[in-house]
């Protein structure tokens, strides 16, 4: 490589540094304090459990049910009686940005195998929200799901507005393109299908993060669709938008709620920092049920090989590694739920040896098509892992007892 080439690389690195430094400097100057929220929920109310004014179901939190069963076992008491009812098929879809193309492929491949069940419960986090949404409504929406993620570019979802975002303190990108997509796809037919499924006792749950309280919010989408509210469709669109709104990057979504007769304002965003996969049901999980986990991405982050990451990359990698660890921990919790309820656990994740760009926000249609194909093949072939990632005996790494090791060749 000649001197001119080195010079170009030097200029490129300086330009890249300035590109990072200028927004950070602006953030320090004007973006450190966000806009005030008009009439937020008072702090004493945020720590108390809220109940719906019109109860929609006997909701069950999987974590609470698991702990109750394990607590009885630890105390030597008899386990709670097994709930009556037929086994359920529960679908849990994780977040993962562009990796949703993989889960879309897995669902469509599963349909092609003829073994895909009708989901009694579907849950979604982050980009898993729209995937779980369409999966819940059935194979009728497979083509829409595939087309949505196969040809997606980032500008179809978000567009940069860094200066305006930093001045207002709301976000570096606008989510207006995603709003238009949701307006197009969540129409009257979808609302009717949602209400019909809910009337059959099936449930769709989407998670968001309450930005002001840093707590998880779970939304019963079918209950909203069947509520008769004139703004029901708009609420559902806003919930999906909030689920996909990356905190700090995209503005949080505002909701006006009424608590004890008083109107307050909340801000909601992507819940991926609070949970990666979860289970909620409209009753206890009967024995023989199946919990199907679709991971929008790999089980472990890509490794940094052959180079030492810089400061910014190290910070990003640390956050990414934390989210991956949260995902793996959440799958262990779901596995424990299956153990205490005598249910089946199955997981499909993008293989760790898949070669692609590491950023989940870099949308490349060619890469999306490759991920979709891998997912399709795994879904069609029934490539379900029976245990959470990293928990099989062969995957367990013992503590280090020095600096000399032996590795498989």
Where are these regions (language model features)?
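Patatin-like phospholipase
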Residues: 32-120, 136-409
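Hydrophobic residues within membrane-embedded alpha helices
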Residues: 9, 17-19, 373
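N-terminal secretory signal peptides that target proteins for export/translocation
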Residues: 1-13
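Catalytic nucleophile serine of serine hydrolases
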Residues: 125-126
């Amino acid at each position: 490589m000649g001197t001119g080439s080195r010079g170009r690389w030097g200029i490129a690195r300086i330009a890249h540094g300035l590109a990072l430094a200028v927004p950070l400097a602006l953030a320090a100057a004007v973006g450190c304090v966000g806009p005030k929220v008009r009439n937020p929920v008072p702090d004493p109310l945020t720590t108390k459990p809220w109940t719906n004014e019109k109860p929609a179901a006997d909701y069950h939190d999987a974590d609470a049910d698991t702990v109750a069963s394990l607590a009885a076992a630890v105390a030597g008491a008899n386990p709670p009686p097994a709930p009556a009812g037929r086994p359920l098929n529960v679908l849990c879809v994780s977040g993962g940005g562009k990796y949703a193309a993989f889960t879309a492929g897995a669902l469509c491949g599963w349909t092609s195998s003829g073994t895909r069940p009708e989901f009694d419960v579907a849950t979604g986090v982050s980009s898993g929200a729209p995937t779980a949404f369409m999966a819940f409504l059935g194979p009728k929406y497979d083509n829409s799901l595939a087309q949505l993620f196969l040809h997606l570019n980032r500008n179809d979802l978000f567009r940069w507005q860094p200066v305006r975002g930093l001045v207002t303190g709301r976000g570096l990108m606008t989510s207006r393109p995603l709003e238009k997509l949701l307006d197009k796809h969540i129409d009257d037919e979808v609302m009717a299908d949602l209400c019909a499924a809910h009337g059959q006792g099936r449930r769709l749950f989407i998670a968001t993060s309450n930005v002001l309280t840093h707590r998880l919010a779970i939304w019963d989408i079918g209950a909203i669709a069947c509520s008769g509210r004139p703004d029901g469709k708009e609420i559902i669109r806003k919930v999906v938008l909030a689920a996909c709104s990356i905190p700090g990057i995209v503005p949080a979504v505002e909701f006006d709620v009424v608590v004890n007769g008083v109107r307050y304002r909340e801000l909601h965003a992507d819940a991926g920092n609070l949970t990666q996969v979860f289970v909620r049901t409209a009753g206890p999980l009967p024995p023989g049920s199946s919990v199907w986990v679709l991971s929008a991405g790999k089980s472990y982050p890509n490794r940094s090989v052959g180079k030492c990451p810089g400061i910014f990359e190290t910070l990003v990698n640390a956050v990414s590694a934390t989210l991956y660890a949260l995902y793996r921990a959440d799958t262990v919790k779901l596995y424990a739920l299956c153990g205490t309820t005598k249910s089946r656990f199955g997981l499909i994740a993008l293989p760790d040896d898949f070669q692609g760009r590491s950023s989940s926000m870099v949308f490349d249609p060619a890469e999306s098509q490759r991920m979709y194909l891998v997912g399709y093949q795994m879904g069609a072939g029934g490539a379900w892992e029976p245990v959470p990632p990293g928990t099989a005996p062969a995957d367990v790494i013992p503590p280090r007892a020095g600096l000399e090791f032996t590795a498989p060749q």
